[in-house]
Amino acid sequence: MLDIKFLRTNFEEVKAKLQHRGEDLTDFGRFEELDTRRRELLVQTEELKSKRNEVSQQISVLKREKKDAESLILEMREVGEKVKDLDNELRTVEEDLERLMLSIPNIPHESAPVGETEDDNVVARTWGEVKEFAFEPKPHWDLATDLGILDFERAGKVTGSRFVFYKGAGARLERALISFMLDLHTDEHGYEEVLPPYMVNRASMTGTGQLPKFEEDAFRIESEDYFLIPTAEVPVTNMHRDEILNKEQLPIRYAAFSSCFRSEAGSAGRDTRGLIRQHQFNKVELVKFVKPEDSYEELEKLXNDAERVLQLLELPYRVMSMCTGDLGFTAAKKYDIEVWIPSYGTYREISSCSNFEAFQARRANIRFRREPNGKPEHVHTLNGSGLAIGRTVAAILENYQQEDGTIIIPEVLRPYMGGKTVIK
């Protein structure tokens, strides 16, 4: 959520920056109308309440003196009705303004490339050499099915499309990656491990920006009005909702493993085979709470921490600086890390690393004090995948495949695989 005072005094500047996102700003223009009416109603209500208090004192004096106060009493009844009507209108206007503020996306950072679509994203850097195969490489779903380590067909029978059973060495590989990533981020990168709830309430989904705009993308448990988490970012960020932190606590860095659940409502017909786009998948998420002046340095570190996973796995990748039209709703600046997938003949996203500045913290009311009695300020929040496990499995299967259909296990994972070197 944007700062309403900043928006009020910089309306045209904010509007121009949001236009770089390619957003529909039809409702945005209502801000000035609603904000002005809200302030008018506040003034009118306070004036009437002040008058009511004054006249109430006059009525008390008249009654003590046993004088006629009927005319003033009638006047106060009218004032009371007016106050009631104004309060009702004010409540409606404030609800409309709140809904509008929750629907306005974050302002892009000045360093984000200006553009409209993913075609305008900029390659920031690449790492590793794309492997040239002496044979036609197979897609990971064929490799895994032939090896008996993934079962999409039975998962479809048990649940439906976009689900999978991991079996044998496939399940062990998934578990190995989770442990490897958590060990790396906690032991070497300084994150604290968190195992979060997989269900959250509506306030949590609103705090991180999934609601109200993207409710159709979420799995909701209607009986409780809970949501299955689309990412550990939601519960972990909301750990500190409605809290005031001390500056000495910052930066806070969490690494959280969780399963993630997404309806993929807008992805019909895309990536229908394999692990790239599942309704349920595992992920290690990195979440940070930092002082505002440190957030862009922390964004660079966040991306480096996520990249380190791919470097140790020796998987070629590139880092994309996302343009203003492809930032998503909540980010001020975002890097996508994309790993090479041979069967696609291109790079595919395996991590998004974002700086939300105070956007989420304002929605979730997460603040800190620089001094013990100082005025609370909003923290800046960041998060990034470190990494998406299923897509990492897909990248390993395809990049490490041999002509006979076996898979060489990356050296760094072998201690987690019981010393095994090959999946066959």
Swiss-Prot record:
Residues at which ATP binds: 262-264, 349-352
Functional pathway: Aminoacyl-tRNA biosynthesis; selenocysteinyl-tRNA(Sec) biosynthesis; L-seryl-tRNA(Sec) from L-serine and tRNA(Sec): step 1/1
UniProt GO MF annotations: ATP binding; catalytic activity, acting on a protein; serine-tRNA ligase activity; transferase activity
InterPro entries for this protein: aa-tRNA-synt_IIb, aa-tRNA-synth_II, aa-tRNA-synth_II/BPL/LPL, Ser-tRNA-ligase_type_1, Ser-tRNA-synth_1_N, SerRS_1_N_sf, SerRS_core, tRNA-bd_arm
Binding locations of L-serine: 231-233, 285, 385
EC number: 6.1.1.11
Location within or outside the cell: Cytoplasm
Lineage: superkingdom: Bacteria
CDD domains attached to this UniProt entry: SerRS_core (cd00770)
Role description: Catalyzes the attachment of serine to tRNA(Ser). Is also able to aminoacylate tRNA(Sec) with serine, to form the misacylated tRNA L-seryl-tRNA(Sec), which will be further converted into selenocysteinyl-tRNA(Sec).
Similarity comment: family membership: Belongs to the class-II aminoacyl-tRNA synthetase family. Type-1 seryl-tRNA synthetase subfamily.
Free-text domain note: Consists of two distinct domains, a catalytic core and a N-terminal extension that is involved in tRNA binding.
The protein's name in its UniProt record: Serine--tRNA ligase
